[in-house]
């Protein structure tokens, strides 16, 4: 999402960190989630028992988040589950994904 400045991404990161449960590491879905993933990863606990956080900028159908979660290396997260964060959700996200900003669901 090239429309946001680095400073705005840092603000979004802080907003997520204020309400997110702890996570081991953050992984951004290419391309839109890359910047957010790198910024959130700085806050990862590194603890194996904490979930991996999968992030993206916009959730439209949820397909890319679900596919990425299903295709993750099982060795990497077998002792924990995944949690998801998106900045903007155009639809109601699956239960494992939280949206910072939710568009009205009609």
Language-model features: locations:
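PRPP-associated nucleotide enzymes
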Residues: 1-106
